[in-house]
């Protein structure tokens, strides 16, 4: 992979960082010193939980905070300050009430620009989670709405939290299609207000960030018609710190990132249990947490600051600047990877290898219905039995066969997951459209029905048209599964 010149300048040897940290650490702070650390979190933004609520509930930050050298006998006062969106966190950082914050890509740009403009500089020090193609942000409509794709929203009243990652996604969607800003009647509404207004039919659609484009359909009153994966541009959530705090207490920033890395490992080690705990702590349903952070999840947990993420942030800034939505911002010096590099080094991890990796947590295991292992994770599925475990399946057809088999046994399906054939993101099976049927190379019907899931109705229609199948609902796809499928 070719690394841009500015990214190469970030590749500071870990040894130099350690020397710098040790030199900075000379001289104790004093036995009576109390270091106050304000951490701005977004508990209900599911792809940030390993940077916030998980650290808080498992005590991981306390585990790694430095207590030797200049920090000997120092006391720490942690203030966890939660918000449902990024602007209050940026305000808190500008007021120096929050020293460490987490937010999505477009809010990160606003945070960095505001800091530079007000002389309260921040720095991007780590990533929490990403989707390399933009998945996670989305637009939903009422479940019984006649709208099925973005083009249907022309002239309609659509809400989104202004300044959010979802807002950025919607701006990008218009630019990609050459559409003007007044294509729709766009208004700013928080997730809570937008959700209520959608249920009460006061708006035609609502755009939002993680987890709302999955959460609202899961709760039964919405349907997703657009996912950020359609932009094919990365989306991410990252960690920013006040620059003065990082300069004064670099060891604390490194400790935070080490805690983040352990939280990521905890989430991956037993994703079902982790999702259940996150539901307990945040009230976001475990099945929704799992679709983002479990195997095959929409987002990948990885703190490394990859060159392609920097390129994406530069493109985000350019898009906002063209629309005069953000002030001048010098992005390159705002990115500081020395802390995450040092955290990797202290944990014995290979940062350079992680920079090159886009590996997530693929679906794997043995399919109990079709009696074969999962060989192609991008075509696999999963079923979460209510009160039970999560079972992998080798294909969408085998997953739906599993739904029928488990239901026949009297087991209640908490959630079934399939992979979108076009966008590559995980879907709730009952929210997908399906192309079923199909013909072989000789034009004859296949011996067993092909069942291919899609988020978007028009993608399913196109696939069915091109492969001699038909568009089907979830119920129709279930009915098409033969009882002897193995």
Give the ranges of each region predicted by the language model.
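Pocket-lining segment of extracytoplasmic ligand-binding domains
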Residues: 186-187, 192-281, 404-416, 420-422
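Conserved C-terminal helix/tail region of periplasmic/extracytoplasmic solute-binding proteins
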Residues: 321-363
């Amino acid at each position: 992979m070719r690394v841009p010149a500015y990214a190469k300048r970030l590749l500071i040897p870990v040894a130099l960082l350690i020397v710098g940290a040790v030199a900075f650490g000379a001289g104790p702070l004093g036995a009576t010193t109390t270091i106050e650390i304000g951490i701005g979190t977004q508990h209900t933004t599911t792809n940030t939980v390993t940077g916030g609520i998980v650290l808080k509930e498992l005590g991981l930050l306390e585990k790694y905070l430095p207590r030797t050298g200049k920090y000997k006998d120092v006391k720490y006062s942690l203030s966890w300050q939660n918000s449902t969106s990024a602007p209050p966190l940026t305000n808190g950082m500008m007021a120096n009430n929050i020293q460490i914050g987490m937010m999505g890509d477009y809010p990160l740009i606003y945070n960095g620009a505001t800091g530079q403009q007000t002389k309260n500089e921040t720095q991007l020090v780590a990533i929490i989670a990403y989707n390399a193609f933009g998945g996670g942000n989305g637009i939903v409509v009422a479940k019984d709405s006649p709208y099925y794709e973005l083009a249907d929203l022309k002239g309609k009243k659509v809400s989104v939290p202004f300044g959010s990652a979802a807002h950025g996604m919607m701006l990008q969607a218009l630019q990609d299609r050459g559409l003007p800003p007044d294509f729709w009647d766009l208004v700013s509404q928080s997730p809570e207000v937008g959700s209520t207004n959608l249920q009460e039919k006061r708006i035609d659609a609502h755009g939002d960030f993680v987890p709302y484009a999955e959460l609202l359909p899961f709760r039964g009153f919405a349907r997703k018609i657009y996912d950020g994966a359609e932009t094919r541009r990365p989306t991410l959530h990252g960690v920013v710190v006040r620059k003065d705090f990082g300069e004064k207490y670099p060891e604390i920033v490194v400790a935070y990132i080490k805690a983040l890395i352990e939280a990521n490992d905890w989430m991956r080690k037993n994703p079902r249990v982790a999702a259940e705990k996150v539901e307990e702590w945040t009230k976001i349903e475990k099945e929704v947490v799992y679709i983002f952070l479990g195997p095959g999840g929409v987002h990948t947990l990885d703190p490394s600051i990859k060159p392609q993420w920097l390129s994406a942030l530069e493109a985000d800034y350019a898009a906002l600047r063209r629309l005069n939505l953000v002030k001048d911002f010098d992005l390159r010096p705002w990115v500081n990877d020395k802390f995450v590099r040092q955290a990797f080094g202290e944990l014995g991890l290979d940062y350079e290898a992680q920079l090159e990796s886009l590996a997530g947590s693929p679906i794997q295991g043995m399919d109990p219905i079709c009696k074969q292992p999962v060989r192609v994770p991008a075509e696999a599925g999963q079923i979460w039995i209510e009160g039970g475990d999560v079972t992998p399946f080798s294909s969408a057809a085998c997953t739906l066969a599993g739904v029928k088999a488990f239901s026949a046994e009297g087991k209640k399906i908490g959630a079934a997951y399939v992979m979108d054939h076009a966008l590559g993101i995980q879907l709730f099976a009952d929210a997908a459209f399906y192309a079923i049927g199909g013909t072989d190379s000789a034009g004859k019907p296949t011996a067993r029905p092909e069942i291919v899931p899609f988020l978007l109705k028009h993608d399913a229609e196109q696939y069915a048209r091109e492969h001699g199948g038909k568009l089907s609902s979830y119920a129709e796809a279930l009915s098409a599964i033969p009882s002897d499928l193995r």
